[in-house]
Structure formats: structure tokens, C-alpha cells
Amino acid sequence: MTLTLLDELLLFSGATLLVALFIGRGLAAGWMVTILYGGQLLTLLKMAALGYGGGIIASSLSFTVMGQNLSWRFDALSWFFALITLGSALLSSWFACGAWERSYAKQGGNIWLFHLAMALNVLSMLILLASGDLLSLFIGWELVSWAGFLLMALAGGVATQAAMRYITYAMAGGMAIFGGLALVYSSSGSLQLDAVLIAVESMSTTKLWLLVILFGGGFGVKMGLLPFHLWQAPAYAETPGPGSAFLGAISSRMGLFAILLVLVKLFGIVNIDSLKIPFTLIDARDLLAWIAVFTIIFPTFTAMKQNDARHLLAWHGIGQGGYMLLGVVVADAMGGAGGLLHVFNHATYQAALFMAVTAVIHRTGTADLNKLGGLVVRMPLSFMVLLIGIIGLAGLPPMNGFVSKWLVYRSLLNEGMPLLFLAAVIGTLGTILSVYKLIHNIFLGQLRVEHEQVKEAPWSMMAPMLILAAIIFITGLFPGIPLAWVASVQEVVGLPATDYTLGGVESVSGSLDMIWVIGVLFAGFGIGAVIFYSAGRSKRVHQLDNYAGGHFLSADVRYQYSDNFYAGLMHLVGGWYRGSFLWLEKSVISLIDFLSLVMQGLYRRANAEFYLLSTALFVMAWVVI
Amino acid sequence: MNGALALTIALPLLGAFLLPVLMRVSVAFGVWIGPAILAYGCWILGDLWLTGSMQPFSVALGGFAPPLGINLYADTLALLFALAAQLLGLIFWPFKLDQDSARRQALMLLLVAASTGLALSGDLFNLYVFYELTAVATFGLVAASGTSAAYAATIRYLILSGIGSVLTLFGIALIYGQTGTLNLAHLAQLAPEQLSNELGLAAFLSLLIGIGVKAELFPVNTWVPEVYATASSRLSAFLAGLVSKLALLIILRLLLLVFHQPEAAQVILILGILGVVSGELAAWRAKEMRRMLAFSSIGQLGVLFIAMALPDGQGMLAVLALALHHLVIKSGLFMLADGWGGALQRLRGSAAASPLAAGLFVLFSLSLVGMPPLPGFWAKFTLITELAGQTEPLYLMGLTVFLLATVVEAAYLFRVAAIIYQSAPQERRPDEIPKAGGLSLATAGLFGAGLIATTLLIAPVGDRLQTIAAQAQDVDLYINTVFPATPGASQ
């Protein structure tokens, strides 16, 4: 038996897990695991033909249990997501090695468990991405859920509580998928993709609706789609730094992967489009699009309220997921490309942002946006990385986030969906405002006296951050590189493929060439620089000396406050923050609590014989009548 | 060799009556006699299982051919559960030596003999006798723990079980009055003409409620939380793990062979759904490990009843897989609960104190909520695919309830896991943290190892379960085995 490339990849990943498990307590274990991730990435790159539309690579691993065939294989879709997974795993793990690891262990963290959880997450994600039928998809799905639980819970305390909330949501989602699986099986008699594809054609509308709700809801839980989003931000934010970079980059995209595979590829956007909601003008597809849009808006504005940098970023992670789904649901060449490209772009800048914030925590010990400020001179490289990251997150040129968002907007306009477009723009507005809060409160404004001696983050942390920053810029300049992979993914899932060039897209309804855009932008910067430097000498003063503008104030006087940022805006939109989703969640829990009390009362009653006899009488009466 | 089957019941029975006397003569000899008998029983059954041709066979006791004489019926299903009874009897053997040990060991032998009899009996009256014997042995064993709570729980159980027995007897009387026979194979022949009427239904329902007391059927299961919380963990494990399944097996046999009314299945389905809802929800607020496990056991048995209600024995495979899975998991969990009694909040920090036990708890919980690729997932998968294939809306409701209950189950099980893995509170001395250890941990480890082995060997295990289920589903095979076409050829 010869090993296929996919076998090699999975074995490699399994070996990484074993290394983390058995020698993960030793010296330099982190570096060893990181190198192994690099090896996995190389194996994946050997399969690069997949990313350019090169067929399927199957795994030799397949077996039959209770009449069900289980198989695993990689295609362009899996390859694209696996690339992001392994890339973010490699860089997050690299980031964790060395300085961060030592300080984490010093604070009482279990670094062995951390590396183990990371390796487990990567392996389970690869298994999920390789799934060749719906049953292996479900197996992979559950593995990813529980592996994620381990990574989220390992910090203990608040993190464990957040992880508990996550796993309850994830179980609910998982069971919805499980139910959907059973329904699919009952009509197709098999869970193989081709059999399901045929069965979908003859399915009744009711059943299709039910399946769209079950699968959409189930997969949506992991994506953090409204109204199942409450778990995500605390769970990701409280994970130890590099872990949240990894989770924020890729974890919830597994939901999008599954949606692409099941709802888009198997059920088909056309079929979903034909599901009308009675007595209204909208259909299931519009419903998904509007859910996506609300997922953009609400979490983004919630992010603006956060005072913890990690929570702020995690809330954005939910909102950005909305853009991806929106693009995919619009489903024309540009929209699909935008949604899929955003998966890649989001992973790059989200990981960079989480890392930058973790670097700040590493040096200052806090992520509280009200207790930081002025670090730009102390940590200039981290500032640069964060700046590049937030430009990407806000979707502004010249970074990669602009390209994907532009594609999504363009497709909304092309397809005549102005309301959705407007809503998406409102979301972007919120993003820009809140990322400004992020960079301002950490790096700009007044430096705190206690941070005067803060140094730049160590190189073990800086290197992966700089690599990510470079990727963000380069894929912003040449979006054609990832767009090539995206186009093959579109073909695989049955969406129209986009017509891409190195600098962007070619289309009759509007082209984009980032090389030109960035060229013009940098020409502008150049002119600005010429004016700045020709204006004469500037005088350098100590940072703590330059706030007072001539007044005699010592540095320990706070005269620039970052507290209660956007007070005016919050006053304006405050009425919308009623916490209705929290209320919904609480009422479900109270309901279960109440029912549980009733049931316990039922079992606590002493007159058990009465139950027995009355049941007997009741059934007898039922028989006689 | 087939004749030796009767020994698996007779020897433990004999042992049970002789043990108190033998213990007086020689303690050293008396201590080993019980395990020796059970080990021999395991060997007989294991031998039958391995060397037999996998064809069912019937053993007529006392030389009278059925339906006049009584017979033991051994297909792979019955053998499997008989083997489980002997093996679990051995595993949960009350090794502790004190002045009560003779009585406790004798009762345990009695319980195993009765359980084996329940698995193997081929006629209704013997089933009833063994059923009563199980009840008597259980009362004795629960009360043996000696606390006043245990006595109170036993009394409640005794009364409930007594009324249940009367109902069972009433059902049997109805059947006998109608058909004049109690042999299951004979009944299977006569049933389509004589029992597919209201009388038959009434008989079945009184049997269902009567036997349901032991099978933790809602709403006659109110004894469960008290008894499991007060009896010794080993006994709770045996009761929740095995005895409830055997009671279930009787109902399943009756349903398959004798009562084909759709109403019968419907009642089981409704009661099963109510069992799942009540059990899992009650477990959500349970403040103590064993009580939580007891409620969860009620819920799991409810799931089994839902599976059993599938028409024409379609749920056979699901029932079998779920029952065996629950047997392993609950036994293991009760063993862990042995060292982890008391309020759940007390368990903070016990993962650091006993990491293996905590790991096993997580493993069992994961399998119980059905995480693939653990066996629990496959058991649940067989159930939901069958349920989703039904057109009757009540089955789909069963499916929905089952899935929702799993979410609740995961929430409360992992809440406990989170407590276990929390760091211990500062003010507590290390010796105050409950530790799971010794024999119970070893036993739980055994079940854990079995679970992992099954995970790895899931494909062959699945195939074997499918053949067992197919054989048990075959009504004609049952009749032909007990009444061979050419008389006298069976022995």
C-alpha cells in the first residue's frame, strides 16, 4: 500500500499530536511542535495542485462500520481551508515558543496541555476538512468541537466557564446536525455525497426547509451566527494568547466550510433559493443573507463597547464571519470570491491582531483598554503590526481586507441588493470606529508612568507577527495569489468562478486592480513625505514630556482619558443594547431549571405506588375504551 | 455441552444456599466458592459463545419437552446477557470481609442466578419466578448497607416492586386464561389468533408496568434515585447496568414474539419519551454524583424504550447497542462515584488528586453524550437513523426529545467535569479532597479499557451486533428452535 499525500499529512499531524503528548513536557517541546507544523504545511504545499483546480487526493484510510462507509479526501475546498489552518497553527505555535511560554508557565499555566490542545485542534480540523461523506463530516465536526473545548477550557476560571457555555451551544448545534443527518439518511439511504446529491432533487419542500434550518443552525453555531453568537467572544478571548490567535483565525470558519460543503455544494443555492417563506416576499436564501448582515452589525457594535482588547477583537471575529456568509449567499462570481477570500484575509489579520494584543499583555500585564496608552514609542513594531491588522480588519486599502470586502459590496450592488449593501456598510462603519478605539487606547494618547520602562516584544513573538503583517500587505497588493485558490474552491462547490488577475478581478461590471490602487496611494504618501521632510528640522522630546503643550504638568497627572470612549455615540445607540440575546439565553436556562425542579419534585414524592396504580388504571381504561 | 447451560443458573443458586453454612465451616473456602462458581459460569457461557455454531438452541429442563416442560432458550442475545450477568457478578463481587459478608455474598449469588435465569428462560412463568428472585436479592443487598436511608429506600422499593409483581402476575394470568400456555414459543404461535385483541393488550400493559418497575420505566421508577443513592456503588452499578437491561429484554422479547399491537409500541414510546424528559431534566439540578447518575440512568432507559417502540423489531440493533453501551458506561461511572460521594461542589480539585479517575470520568461522559468515534456515537447513530425513517410523527418527536436531552446531558455531565478539574479551594487540606481509588478505580479502569477496545474494534463489533440483532428478530427461528419440525431432534 502506498501512502497518498493526504495520508502523509494526516500521519504527520498525528505524529505532532504524539510528540506533544509524550515529550511535550521536555525542553524546547514548543519548538519541536512548531517545526512539525512547518512539516505539515510543507506536505500540504506538496498538494498545491489542489489549490489550482487539480482534482481530488483520497486517503487510503476508509472503513465500513455498521453498513456505513467512511472515507476521507482532499479537494480544493479542503486544501484552501487546510492552508489557513496550518498557516495559523504554525505562526501561533511559533509565537507561543520561547518568551511567552516561559511567562505563561511562570503564571501557573500548563504549557504541555496547551501544546497538546493545539495539536489536537489541528489534527481534528484536518480530519474534518478531509471528510468524504456526511458521516465523516459529523465525526470531524464533533472532534473539532471537543478539541476546541479543551483549548478554551485549559486556562481555568473564567475561561472554563466560557468554554462550558461554548460546549453547550456546540452540543446543541451538533445535535441539530445529527438530526439533519438522520433525516438525510432516511431519504437517501446513504450518507455518501453523490447519493445525497441525487436525493436532494426529489426532496419535498418541507423536508428541505427542515434540513436547511437544522444544518444551517447547527453549522451556524460554530460560526457564531445570530442568535447563536453569545458564546464565541468570551470563549476565544479567554483562551491563552496564541490559542486565541489560532481560534480567532480559523476555528469558527469550520462552520463556513461545512456550510459550503452541505448547503452550497450538496443542497445547492438554487434549491435554497426556491424555499419561500409563506406570506412574505423572502426566501431561505434572503433569510440567510439577512442573518449574515445582522451578524455583521450587532456583534460589531458590541465590540465597540468592550474594554478588553481581546474581547473587542473576538467580537469582531463574529461580525467578520457575517461578511463571509453574506458573500457566499449572494453566490455570484464576485460575492463568492469575496466571501471566500475574506476567510483567508480575516485569518491573517485576526491572528496578527490577537498576537499584537498578546504581546502588549506580555509586556504590560493587561489588556484593559482603560489602563493602557501611549505605547507607540515603546513598542513601535507591535504598533505597526496592529496598525496593519486594523486596516485589514476595517477593510481599507492597501491591506487585504479591502479586497474581499470590496468584492462583497460590489456583488451586492451588481445583484441589486441595496438594503443589504447599506447594512453591510453600517457594519464597516462600526468596525472602523471600534478599531480606532483599539489602537488609540493602547498605542496613542498619554503614556502611563508605570509603562515607561516597557520594551518591545521579544523576537520569538515579533517574527510571526511581522510575517503575518507582510502577508496582509502582500495579499493586499497581489490579491490574485489567494484568488487563484478561491476560484478553484468556487468551482468545487458549484459557484461561478471569478475571473481574477494578479492585482484583483476582471469583470464587465467593475474591475479592481490593487496594484494601481496601492500605487496611487503610495504616490500620495510620497508627496506627503516630501512636504514633511522639506518643512525643516523637528525637535525630539521625551514622550512623557510632550503632552502638556507648554503647561507645567508632571507626567503622573492624567489629562487624557481613554475611559468611556465614544460616550456620545454610545448615548445615541445605547437604546439598542438591551441585551435581548442575553435575556433569551437566560430565559432558556431558567426554563430548563424550572422544569428540572418540577421533575425532581416528581421523583421526590413519596407516593410512588399511587403513580403505579394510577398508570395501570389509566392504561386499562385506555384499552377498554 | 448445551445441557451445561442449566448449571449457570443452578450452581449459583446452590452456592447461595450453601454459602452461609460453608462460611461457618471454613472461611477461607467459603470466600472463594462464590467467585469460583461465577468464573465457572463465565467459562461455560464463553465456551458456548465461542464454540457454538451461533445457532440458537433450547434446553428442556427435567426431560419434559416444551410446552409441557419448561425450557431454557439460548440464542446469541440471551447468551450475551447471561454472560454479562455472570461476568458483572464477578466484577462487582462483594469482596469486603466482615460479619455480614456471608449474607451479602449469598445474596449476590442469588442475584446472579436470577439474572442469568431472566436472560435464558423460555417461558413466562419462570421469568416471573426469576424476576421475583431478583427483587428479593436486591432488597436484601440494598438493606445490607445498614443505614436508615437505605432501609427507607428499600421499603419504598419493596412496596412498589410488590405491587408491580401483582400486576405482572395479573398479566400472566390473563394470558394463561386466554391461551392455556405460558411457553413463549407456544405463545408466539398462538398469539396472532388469540392475543391480538384488547385482552392481549391489557395483559401486555399490565406486564409492561409490572416489569417496568425494574426496567426504570416512567412513571414507576420513583424508587431509582433513592435506592441508587443509598445502596453501595457496586450494587447500584449492577442494578443500573444489568438488571434494568434484563427487565427490558423480557419486555422486548414479549413485544417481538407475542404482542404485535401498534398500541403496545405506542404506549412504550410515550412512556419512553416521558422517561427521557423527566430523567435528564431531573439530573440537571442534581447536587450529588450518584443521584445525578441515577436520574441520567432513567433518561437512558427512556431512550432504550424509545428504541424498543420501533415497529417490527427494527430497533433491535439500536436497543442492543444502546443497552450494552449503557451497561458499560453506567457501571464505570457508578464505580467512579464510589469515591466521589456527597455534594458535587466537594469534588473541586479531585482531578489533581486522582487524575486517572478524572480522565475516566471524561471518557465515559464523552461516550455517553455520543462523541464520535467512541461507541456511544454508533449506538446513537443506529437509533436516530431508524427513528428518522419512521413516518409517524410521534417517532420524530421521540427523535427531537432524544437530541435535546443529549444537549442537557452534555451540559450537566461537563459541569461536573469542570468542577473536578477546578483547582482545590485554598482552605481545604489535601486529605479532605475526595479521592477515587483502590478497587473501584481499578474496576472503572477495566470498563474504560473495554470502551477503548470497542472503539478500536468498532467495525467487527458492529457486525457481530448486527448478526445478534438479526437472529433475535427472527420469530420463526425462535419457534422452530423450541418446537423442531421433526419432534425430538432438538436435543
Q: Residue ranges of each PLM-predicted region?
A:
Chain B
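Alpha-helical transmembrane segments and their helix-start/interface "positive-inside/aromatic belt" motifs
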Residues: 26-38, 152-162, 354-358, 438-444
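Hydrophobic alpha-helical membrane-insertion segments
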Residues: 33-49, 162-170, 361-369, 446-460
